[in-house]
Swiss-Prot record:
Family assignment from sequence similarity: Belongs to the 5DNU family.
Residue numbers binding substrate: 16-17, 31, 67, 75-78, 135
Keywords: Cytoplasm, Hydrolase, Metal-binding, Nucleotide-binding
Residue(s) at site: Appears to be important in orienting the phosphate for catalysis: 16
PANTHER family attached to this UniProt entry: 5'-DEOXYNUCLEOTIDASE HDDC2 (PTHR11845:SF13)
Record-linked Pfam families: YfbR-like
MF GO annotations: 5'-deoxynucleotidase activity; metal ion binding; nucleotide binding
Protein name from the UniProt record: 5'-deoxynucleotidase YE1340
Binding partners and assembly: Homodimer.
Presence of the UniProt keyword Manganese in the record: no
Localization per record: Cytoplasm
Cofactor: a divalent metal cation
């Protein structure tokens, strides 16, 4: 018997942004799906508009599993995780152990197929960068949603994430920011009006 998917199903029980007041709580499972949507889009944008040659389907899968180890480690708040290089390095080692534990839960004949999704060492540098871009973009989108709902708790997180996005800047991310991100600050009525015309 394998407990792999029973563990993954518990990602929905792990809340993100645990030290901040949230208008709407976000869990790791739904965050992972949004990161998969965005990473897939970034890969397609890169391929179509900027001469990329990425496997967008694989990128979506990598993004889907990018936080899977948090079912074992929990979601450590970013300011703690990256407080200094030593803590960040040690936390990476903890994540690696958690990834390995998850892989070992699988039947042996399936381990290789999932190892290349769960273990970042199997990602190309380009794949890794794109998933990290999508992850940061989704955190930024969460900030926009919270701020548009009147929650000023996310002001500093938004500023921090703008710096992160600037460091990870790419043509495909610029395109996504210009074409898709403005809608995240609008109400349902505002985004529905355009689609009904």
């Amino acid at each position: 018997m394998s407990h792999f998917f029973a563990h993954l199903s518990r990602l929905k029980l792990i809340n993100r942004w645990p030290l901040m007041r949230n208008v709407r709580t976000e869990n790791v499972s739904e965050h992972s799906l949004q990161v998969a949507f965005v990473a897939h889009a970034l890969a397609i944008i890169k391929n179509r508009k900027f001469n990329g040659n990425l496997n967008a389907d694989r990128i979506a899968l990598l993004a889907m599993y990018h936080d899977a180890s948090e079912v074992i480690t929990g979601d450590l708040p970013t300011p703690i995780k990256y407080y200094n290089p030593q803590i960040a390095h040690e936390y990476k080692k903890i994540e690696k152990v958690a990834q390995q534990k998850l892989i070992e839960m699988l039947p042996e004949e399936l381990q290789h197929d999932f190892r290349c999704l769960l273990d970042e060492h199997y990602y190309s540098e380009e794949e890794k960068a794109l998933v990290k871009q999508a992850d940061a973009l989704c955190a930024y989108l969460k900030c926009l949603e919270e701020l548009s709902a009147g929650n000023n708790e996310f002001i500093q997180a938004k500023v921090r994430l703008e710096k992160t996005l600037a460091m990870r800047q790419s043509p495909e991310m610029d395109y996504f920011m210009e074409v898709f991100v403005p809608s995240f600050s609008l109400s349902l009525d505002e985004i529905s009006l355009d689609s009904l015309d």
